[in-house]
Swiss-Prot record:
It holds the Pfam family PALP. Its EC number is 4.2.1.20. Pathway: Amino-acid biosynthesis; L-tryptophan biosynthesis; L-tryptophan from chorismate: step 5/5. PROSITE patterns: TRP_SYNTHASE_BETA (PS00168). SUPFAM superfamilies: Tryptophan synthase beta subunit-like PLP-dependent enzymes. It catalyses: (1S,2R)-1-C-(indol-3-yl)glycerol 3-phosphate + L-serine = D-glyceraldehyde 3-phosphate + L-tryptophan + H2O. This is Tryptophan synthase beta chain. Belongs to the TrpB family. The gene is trpB. It comes from Acidithiobacillus ferrooxidans (strain ATCC 23270 / DSM 14882 / CIP 104768 / NCIMB 8455) (Ferrobacillus ferrooxidans (strain ATCC 23270)). One of its GO terms (molecular function) is tryptophan synthase activity. Gene3D superfamilies: 3.40.50.1100. Tetramer of two alpha and two beta chains.
Length: 399
């Protein structure tokens, strides 16, 4: 692969990415790109971002050796990158802080966001309150039912939560509504996209704000083990936690990178959210990437036990990493994720998010095939408090 320097000036990762949006949004995206590039060159902006990540988010978080789990599985040593310990309980806050600082720098008084599991909505509401901005979060009706505690948290933090009743009433539809809002209110409003999808410059901007995950993990692994990890594993919905972990390792060819999509009820059932594993290239939400679509190019409905993975597309950089073979993409089913959720609870005393449990499920498959002197880093992208009611209901327990 040589030196990795993507995206290009037009936001392309090979044939993926780009800026497929209404003409009315082009000036806003160009303004955003200029502001972001200026901020990246500004030592004061970088210093404030670093300070906020330390003092407000609580970084660096640990790279934790799951010793009991590793012994029980046999094979590779499993290390967990503890994004669940961040303020607000997931990786999402890294990007929300970065984009909110950028919004403030651009003089925007109102921020909007889309959310699936609610974690990005909570993170955006949190930073909007911190920096004194009005906040509106779009969320699909089905996700509002699945993640009612996060909806209440957003409202506690002062955000307005708007239910989206169109389409599948999930993340895809929330994103559509947020884009419509932005087109209408582009002068006053900053759209805080929560994943590495969307039109350029969002995929590169969100990646850069999340690369702190991989930068920390790389240094921590060298400190703890004296060498780089053999394998990185992260769940992939839109793909922000995964690209945050993977990006600093892309040129380290000996390090395997594996993204785990939502296998739902099984890849053969059509009831899943695995565009990289089963989909094909197309255009959605302003960028070209792998999608779940039918023969006519219509987006197919998705299913996952996890609201945060329930999305028919994926970030364009993941599409490129798949095609070049630098990263591998697999799927874990609802059932496998639930089993992994329980196993981590009972071996390490950590309750993971159902999204993260998909990554754990694949790590549990892979570790026994490796040697005990090899290491796997799993990105524990979030904590599972938000999923307690979902898991209890599936097991017939009424909370």
């Amino acid at each position: 692969m040589g030196t990795y320097a993507l995206p290009d000036a037009f936001g392309h990762y090979g044939p993926y990415g780009g800026r497929f949006v209404a003409e009315t949004l082009i000036p806003a995206l160009e303004e955003l790109e200029r502001a972001y590039q200026e901020a990246q060159r500004d030592p004061e902006f970088r210093a404030e971002l670093h300070s906020e990540l330390r003092q407000f988010v609580g970084r660096p978080n640990p790279l934790y050796h799951a010793g009991r789990l590793s012994r029980e599985l046999g094979g590779a040593q499993i290390y967990l990158k503890r994004e669940d310990l961040n303020h607000t309980g997931a990786h999402k806050i890294n990007n929300a802080v970065g984009q909110a600082l950028l919004a403030r720098r651009m003089g925007k008084k109102r921020v909007i966001a889309e959310t699936g599991a609610g974690q990005h909505g909570v993170a955006t509401a949190t930073v909007a309150t911190r920096y004194g901005m009005e906040c509106l979060v779009y969320m699909g009706e089905e996700d509002i039912q699945r993640q009612s505690s996060n909806v209440f948290r957003m409202r506690l933090l002062g955000a307005q939560v708007t239910a989206v009743s169109s389409g599948t009433r999930t993340l895809k539809d929330a994103l559509n509504e947020a884009l419509r809002d932005w087109v209408t209110n582009v002068e006053s409003t900053f759209y805080v996209i929560g994943t590495v999808a969307g039109p350029h410059p969002y995929p590169v901007m969100v990646r850069d704000f999340h690369r702190v995950i991989g930068d920390e993990a790389r240094a921590q692994c060298l400190e703890l083990t004296g060498r780089l990890p053999d394998c990185l594993i992260a769940c992939v919905g839109g793909g922000s936690n995964a690209i945050g972990l993977f990006y600093p390792f892309i040129e380290d060819r000996a390090v395997r990178m594996i993204g785990v999509e939502a296998g739902g009820l099984g890849l053969g059932t059509g009831q899943h959210a695995a565009p990289l594993t089963t989909g094909r290239p197309g255009v959605l939400h302003g960028n070209r990437t792998y999608l779940m679509e039918d023969e006519d190019g219509q987006i197919l409905p998705t299913h996952s036990i996890s609201a945060g993975l329930d999305y028919p597309g994926v970030g364009p950089e993941h599409a490129y990493l798949k095609d070049t073979g630098r990263a591998e993409y697999v799927a874990a089913t609802d059932e496998e994720a639930l089993a992994a959720f329980h196993r981590l609870c009972r071996t390490e005393g950590i309750i993971p998010a159902l999204e993260s449990a998909h990554a754990l499920a694949h790590a549990f498959r892979l570790a026994p095939t490796m040697r005990s002197d090899q290491t796997i880093i799993v990105n524990l992208s979030g904590r599972g408090d938000k999923d307690i009611h979902t898991v209890a209901a599936l097991e017939g327990i009424h909370l």
